[in-house]
Amino acid sequence: MRNSLIALTIGLLCTTAFSAAAAPNWKEIVGPAQAKLPEPLAKIIWRTDLQKALAEAKEQNRPLLISLRCLPCKQCSAFDKDVMEGGPLLSPLLSQFITVRLTDAKAIDLRFLPVHGYQDLDISWWGYFLSPEGKLYAIFGGKDHVSDATRISPEALAVTMKRVLAHHYDSRREKWDIDGPAPDLSGEPRSTTTLPGYQAWFSRGGAETKKQECIHCHQVSEIIRQPAIDAGTFDKFRDTQIWPLPENVGIVLDRDDGLLVKSVQANSAGANAGIRAGDSLAVAGERRLFGQADFRGILHRGPQETGTIPVMWLRDGKLMSGELQVSEGWRKTILDWRMSISQGNIGHGPGFFPLAMSKAERQRFNIADDAMGVKPFIYKGSMATAAGLKANHMITAVNGQSPNVVGRSFEWWFRSHFNPGENVTLTVQEAPGKTREITYVIPKE
């Protein structure tokens, strides 16, 4: 009996010691870096072959920066120009990386780039920071309903690169082992065209989709959700709440620093966790943070409804920890700017593009400023056009509802309120004071 108790005690002690050894020493990890950077590369080269770039990174023991840029999109074009030009802020840092530039989502190799949980696909510029073995250090990118410059800046990218370099060249990094597993490179590259939803998505795409040579990033988001849509399990209210903002947990971060807390809303998840203005976020969800996109990624992969997210932060050099307690509805953001949502494969569009009436037109047709005032751009052959909608019709209500929404806001409002197979009735004015109704069925395909 005594020997059994001794054995049990030793076993428990060993288990405790193993658990303690297995837990990352976050105080050391986020503390002062012990890194010595090598001489920068003589020239910044934006490579297009990811596998060759990885081999080059291994040979030189340099981290990789992989940028994905959807060239047709104007969104983030100014930021992309800043990155490509480099300048005195970015060039000295870019020259420390093996840089890769991909301009077609077909070129994404899913073995390296885990787009499903680590890339906001409605954004036309995104960055991945990888180790020479392909382990994921950090991500960079971001946008909101305000603009494409409220979440990212060249200064924010520079700070993130400095943090990644300090982490990569820290002699203790391999011992920490916090960067996740290296990718399995066996087999052929896995393009976005190998995703389960690709064939169904492509077959239902219009002539423009079938004609295009590349795949846009927002279309990858549509492809990813296609199987759930086909299975009838996709919830257009729950499953569209993607990439929450720091403000969703009550935290406002400095854009150019990425992790510095500017303010915390009273009684929010952030405030209740103990976070204050002036703190610097350091760790969340068991991942080290290098910038705002990393934190948003943790939120994105976090609870759908009620739950907790572990978080750590630095205050005057001292590491502190707490939990973000989130409740139902915490993920909600403004969605209509998202191309994959307002004009993607969720439901069906109205069959016209909803342009805004001018102030003079509203006055002429006696339409209140807070009511619907949509001037339709006519799509030839659409169900709305076939039902009699014309370009001179001013739309003032849909099924009796008259919110003041236009453009993509109208598109998402329509898709979120009405389902394929349902009847919709447009109330229109053909001339001032002359009202009629146009009814049609929303197509199922």
Go through each PLM region and give its residues.
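PDZ/PDZ-like domain segments forming the peptide/carboxylate-binding groove
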Residues: 242-283, 287-290, 352-397, 401-404
